[in-house]
Regions:
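Glycine-rich, phosphate-binding/catalytic loops in enzymes
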Residues: 235-236
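Substrate-recognition/specificity elements adjacent to catalytic centers across diverse enzyme folds
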Residues: 8-9, 13-228, 240-242, 246-249, ...
Length: 383
C-alpha cells in the first residue's frame, strides 16, 4: 500500500482510487513518482526542451558553438551532446508557441485531470525534497500538454524526415537513414531490405462467437523495451466520475494508452506511415531571409531559442540559437538553400482529450468519437 492517501485519493497497488477523476490522477502521479522518478523527471525535462542541461566540457562547447554558427556537420554536433537532439527538435518544432496559442482549446475537464496529475507529482516532490530535482518543480499542466504535443510525431518516425532534411542541408542525400516508405527500387533501400526482417508491435481481438470458451479476447503485444522512458507502466485507475481503466502508460503520462475498462478494450501499434513532407523553398537572391510564396517574397518567421548547459551546482550557461518558420512548417536554412518540414499533428495539442475520452468510453461509438478528433493519426488501433 502506498502512502499517497491524501483526502479522497488512495493507492492499493496496483490500483488508484479517487472520488473524482482529478483525485485519481493525483494518486496515479504520486504512485508513478514513487516507482519511476528518474524517468518521470526525464519526461518533465523533455517537455520543457531541457534534456541537454548537462555538465560543461570542451566537446559540449565545440558542438554548441557549431550549432549556433551553422558550421560543421549538424548531426555530428547534435550527437556530441547528450539529450540535445530532442531539445533541438523541441525548439525546431516550436512546441512552446504552439501550446501557448492552442492550450485554451483544451476542454476544462481535460485540463483539470492533467492538473490533478501535476499536483500529484508536486506533492511527492514536497514530501521527498531530498529525492527529487527541485529545479523541476512545480510541474504544471502546461508541461504535460507540451510533452504530449512533442512526443506524438516521434512515434511515427519523424526522425527519418529530420535525418533527410539535415542530409539535404549537408548535400549528402544518400546518407539518409533508412525510410520504410522509400521506393523499393532505391538501391540503398533494396540492399538494406535484403537483411531486414519485418518486426514490430501487434494486437488482435477475438469475438466470443469465434472463441471456444465463448469469451471475448484481446491480445496486446506492443514491442516496448523493458526499462526506460518508453517502457510500459501498468496501472488501474478508478474514480467516482466514471473512470475505470487498466492498462499501460509511459512515465510522465496521465493516461492509459493501451488497455481496457469494464466496457471495452484496445491495443495499439506504431509503424511509419507517410505523414510528413519536405519542401524546398526558393530564396530571394537579394534577401535570403525571404522565400517565395504564391508568387511573392515573404519573410521567414524568426524565433530566438536557447540551449542551457550546466556548469556545476546551480550555475549554467545559456546559448542562443535562431530558428526559422515558413507557411509550410519549421525550416533549416543557410545562405544558399532552405528546406521546410510539414508533418501531421504539427499544430495539434488536444491529444489529452482524445486519450481521456478513450479511457472513459462506454461503447464503440464514444470510443470512435475520440478517434474522430484526429489527434492520434499515426496509431493503428485494435478494438
Amino acid at each position: 500500500i502506498s502512502d499517497c492517501l491524501v483526502g479522497s485519493e488512495m493507492c492499493i497497488r496496483d490500483s488508484v482510487y479517487g472520488d473524482t477523476d482529478k483525485d485519481a490522477a493525483f494518486g496515479f502521479a504520486y504512485a508513478q513518482a514513487e516507482d519511476d522518478l528518474k524517468h518521470v523527471e526525464m519526461m518533465i525535462k523533455m517537455s520543457r526542451g531541457e534534456l541537454s542541461n548537462l555538465n560543461f566540457n570542451s566537446k559540449t562547447f565545440a558542438a554548441i558553438y557549431s550549432l549556433i554558427t551553422g558550421s560543421g556537420d549538424i548531426m555530428e554536433n547534435l550527437d556530441a551532446i547528450e539529450g540535445v537532439e530532442l531539445d533541438f527538435l523541441f525548439k525546431f518544432f516550436n512546441v512552446h508557441e504552439t501550446v501557448n496559442n492552442k492550450i485554451s482549446e483544451i476542454p476544462e475537464e481535460t485540463i483539470n485531470y492533467i492538473k490533478g496529475y501535476a499536483d500529484g507529482l508536486n506533492y511527492y516532490a514536497a514530501k521527498n525534497p531530498n529525492l527529487v530535482d527541485q529545479s523541476l518543480y512545480p510541474a504544471t499542466a502546461y508541461d504535460l500538454v507540451a510533452g504530449m504535443t512533442f512526443r506524438m510525431p516521434l512515434f511515427y518516425g519523424i526522425d527519418h524526415s529530420i535525418a533527410e532534411l539535415i542530409n539535404l542541408m549537408d548535400d549528402q542525400e544518400e546518407k539518409v537513414a533508412m525510410n520504410m516508405n522509400a521506393p523499393s527500387d532505391n538501391p540503398i533501400v533494396a540492399s538494406i531490405n535484403t537483411y531486414f526482417k519485418p518486426s514490430g508491435s501487434n494486437a488482435f481481438a477475438v469475438s466470443k462467437s469465434r472463441s471456444q470458451d465463448n469469451e471475448t479476447m484481446l491480445v496486446i503485444n506492443s514491442h516496448q523495451p523493458l526499462t526506460g522512458p518508453v517502457a510500459w507502466y501498468e496501472i488501474h485507475i478508478k474514480s467516482g466520475e466514471g473512470l475505470n481503466i487498466m492498462g499501460g502508460t509511459f512515465p510522465g503520462s496521465p493516461f492509459v494508452h493501451v488497455g481496457f475498462n469494464e466496457n471495452l478494450g484496445w491495443g495499439a501499434t506504431v509503424n511509419q506511415p507517410d505523414l510528413s513532407d519536405i519542401y524546398e523553398l526558393k530564396l530571394n537572391p537579394e534577401n535570403n531571409d525571404q522565400y517565395e510564396l504564391d508568387g511573392a517574397w515573404v519573410n521567414f518567421t524568426e524565433t530566438d531559442q536557447e540551449f542551457k548547459v550546466k556548469l556545476f551546482g546551480p550555475f549554467s550557461i545559456t546559448y542562443p540559437i535562431q530558428m526559422y518558420h515558413s507557411a509550410h512548417g519549421p525550416v533549416l536554412k543557410d545562405d544558399n538553400k532552405a528546406y521546410a518540414l510539414r508533418f501531421v499533428g504539427m499544430n495539434d495539442v488536444n491529444h489529452s482529450t482524445a486519450w481521456l475520452k478513450m479511457n472513459k468510453s462506454k461503447n464503440i461509438d464514444e470510443w470512435l468519437d475520440a478517434l474522430r478528433m484526429e489527434q492520434l493519426a499515426s496509431l493503428n488501433l485494435v478494438y
